[in-house]
Amino acid sequence: MNKLVSLAKRRGFIFPSSEIYGGLSSCFDYGPLGSEMKKNIKDLWWNAMTRRHQNIVGIDASIMMNPTVWEASGHVASFNDPMIDDKTTKRRYRADHLIENHIEKLHRDGKEAEAAAIKVAYEAAGGTEDPNRTLYNIIIEAGIKAPDTGSADWTEVRQFNLMFQCNMGAVADSAGVVYLRPETAQGIFVNFHNVREASRMKVPFGIAQIGKAFRNEIVKGNFIFRMVEFEQMEMQYFVKPGTQLEAFEAWREERFRWYSETLGMSKEKLHWYKHDKLAHYADLAYDIKFEFPFGIEEIEGIHSRTDFDLSQHQKYSGKSMEYIDQTTNERYIPYVVETSSGCDRTFLALLSDAYQEDVVDGEPRVMLKLAPKVAPVKAAVLPLMKKGEMGEKAAQLCRDLSESFMVQYDDAASIGKRYRRQDEIGTPFCFTVDHDTLENGTITVRYRDTAAQERINMSKAAEFLATKLM
């Protein structure tokens, strides 16, 4: 993980935020390459969700909304995490995550009976008189230890609200309290009828959104995996009650394919996790998890949210959230199937999956084996000599390609060092302008993954890239 963090900063993917002032815990800035790659991820998601589905449209809701939205959604009253501290290091952990990870480890170790017993107690915790105490007892009785130190000296479990509260207006009083949204989903739900009417949508249909969310995470860390400011890519799919399971399975399959096929993630590093303990709004939930260097963690949640959200907003706003089927005249509040992907977590998963070290021509190299669609730079143009006609042709090729693709021009250092630089940032192709270019108009294409080379006509470079990026 340290190598990945070092590469990310050195090559301009991710910087610590406000670093000259010492930074701020779990806040990061995306650099030139990071912002390009993140945009590629978001564009690929947006195209997959909206362009390829005629019944899904987009929205960009406000970060701050009427605070009653968050009362209706349940966030004001219950958007809490159960936290427990390691007395040895004073580090704080989510109690539920410690238990869930312990159960998964027992399964992997073949200790099914022990895992089942802890799971039964864990699932019953929410219905006990003191859920916090119950979680604490499970941790103590199961001998669960702190992942970092192996210590089992724990504090009691306590609840922490995760919403950022701020004030709107000149006076800091309760009347001006607003919240930075902890999720993007509610901006979709409150616009259900606006979008449906404006877009003339009929159930089933979906609303997609990419946007920032904010959570006062007590447990931070693992680079950009868990931050207080992060970006979500969410889609809420509205269906007729009784059809949600069919829609859920369809989206579950499609979302897994997006990671493995569109983004090119290693299938063997992707895992399904079914939630047996469900959130108050859900009747079914799965996570897509990825094998990070620090463990197997969630990158996307797929949830059947029932009619909870629309019903709550109907109750608190006094406005009907019912849908009238024009064919059957049925009236109902739609059920919702949600796909919720973390853009930053996806970014980190892609970097983790792509990072490789190997030897080429007797020289060690670091390579990011990113899918060409995801790579921040699609091609590098490298003149063998930077002066004279060779440099001029290379510069012209770079200008031509830049009209359609993100391309870098590099004429500094030996050609071998330039290849290594491009390998390290994940550039899939290098176009080398050399002596043969001046004689017959061909250039060398060098492939990142294999270091193999071939020659193509310089006039075909744009066509070559377009084909490889399809």
From Swiss-Prot:
It is an enzyme of class 6 (ligase). GO terms for molecular function: ATP binding; glycine-tRNA ligase activity; protein dimerization activity. Its main location: cytoplasm. InterPro entries: aa-tRNA-synt_IIb, aa-tRNA-synth_II, aa-tRNA-synth_II/BPL/LPL, Anticodon-bd, Anticodon-bd_dom_sf, Gly-tRNA_synthase/POLG2, Gly_tRNA_ligase_bac, GlyRS-like_core. One of its GO terms (biological process) is glycyl-tRNA aminoacylation. It catalyses: tRNA(Gly) + glycine + ATP = glycyl-tRNA(Gly) + AMP + diphosphate. ATP binds at residues 215-217, 225-230, 298-299, 342-345. Substrate binds at R94, E183, F230, E231, Q232, M233, E234, E338, T339, S340, S341, G342. The keyword Ligase applies. It holds the Pfam family tRNA-synt_2b. Transmembrane segments: none annotated. One of its GO terms (cellular component) is cytoplasm. It is found in: Cytoplasm. Homodimer. Belongs to the class-II aminoacyl-tRNA synthetase family. Catalyzes the attachment of glycine to tRNA(Gly). PANTHER family: DNA POLYMERASE SUBUNIT GAMMA-2, MITOCHONDRIAL (PTHR10745:SF8), GLYCYL-TRNA SYNTHETASE/DNA POLYMERASE SUBUNIT GAMMA-2 (PTHR10745). This is Glycine--tRNA ligase. It comes from Chlorobaculum tepidum (strain ATCC 49652 / DSM 12025 / NBRC 103806 / TLS) (Chlorobium tepidum).
